[in-house]
Amino acid sequence: MEKIELTEKEREILTLLAQCRYATTKQIVALYFQDSQHSRTAFRRANLLLTKLKNHQLVRHLERRIGGVRAGSGSFVWHITIKGMKALHRPQRFKNKYEPTAHHLEHTLAVTQAYVFLKLLEEAGKIQLERFDFEPTCHRTYATFSGKKIFLKPDAFAQLVLGEYEDSYFLEIDMATESLNRVANQCKKYIAYYQTGIEQREQNGVFPLVLWIVPHDKRKEAISKKIESELNNFHPMFQVVTLEEFSSWIGGRTDE
C-alpha cells in the first residue's frame, strides 16, 4: 500500500468524514476554507483538495447530489473510504457500500450541519466548542431496576463554554418523520437515564439539556406541546428549536 503524505487540512477533513459519515462540499467549505476572500475561490480550493483525496481513493462522493445536478459541485456529498480510514489508522466502523436512503442522508447531513453551525459560532468568538461527539461516541447505556440494559442513542453530544458558563447538550435531530408518541418515548428514555444519576456524576452534577432540532415552526410547536402535556415536571429538561434558529439560540445564550 502506497504511503500518502497528508497535509494538516487533508487529515482534518478525513477525520471529520470518519466521524460524521457524510458532509457536503458546502459544509466542508464552511469549516475549512473560510480564509478565502471570495466564495468562488473557497469552493475551487475545496474541490481541488477533495479531488486529490478522491484520486488517492481516500474519499468518494455519492451519485446523488443535494439539490440535484444543477446545484453544481458544492452539492456533492462526501464520505470516507476504507483506505481513508486506514490512512487515519482508525478501525472501519461504517461500510458505505450502498447509496443511503434519502431520509437517512438528510438526517445525517442535518447532524453535520449542527456541528458546522457550532464551529462557525466558535470562529466568531461566541462560544468555545469543547467537545462534539457524533454517533456512536455520544451513545449512553444504563440499566433498569430489573437489570435490563437500555441504549440511549442521541444524534450528538455537545459541550460548550459560553462566557463563564459551561453548557452541555444531547442533540436530537428530528426530520418530522417520526410520530409524536415516538418522540415522547425517546424523551422518557432521557428521564430514566437522568434518574440513574450516571451522567450527573460525569458532568459535575449537571444533566445536559436535551435539544430537539426540528425542520420548521409547525413541528416545533407540536413537539413542544407533546413534551409539556406528557412529561409533567420533567419538561424543563427539553428544549425545541428549528435548525434555522439553532445558531442564534445557542449564540444568544451568551447574553443571558
Specify the residue positions occupied by each region the protein language model found.
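Nuclease-adjacent, charged terminal/linker segments that flank catalytic cores
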Residues: M1-E99
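Hydrophobic, Leu/Ile/Phe/Ala-enriched alpha-helical segments that form helix-helix packing faces
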Residues: Y32, L50-K54, A114-E122, Y190-I198, ...
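C-terminal regulatory/effector modules of DNA-binding transcriptional regulators
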Residues: L160-E256
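Active-site metal-binding core of divalent-cation-utilizing nuclease and nuclease-like domains
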Residues: I127-Y169, E178-N185
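Short, solvent-exposed loop/turn segments at secondary-structure junctions
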Residues: C20-T24, M85, H139, A176, ...
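Amphipathic alpha-helical dimerization/coiled-coil segments
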Residues: K86-F132
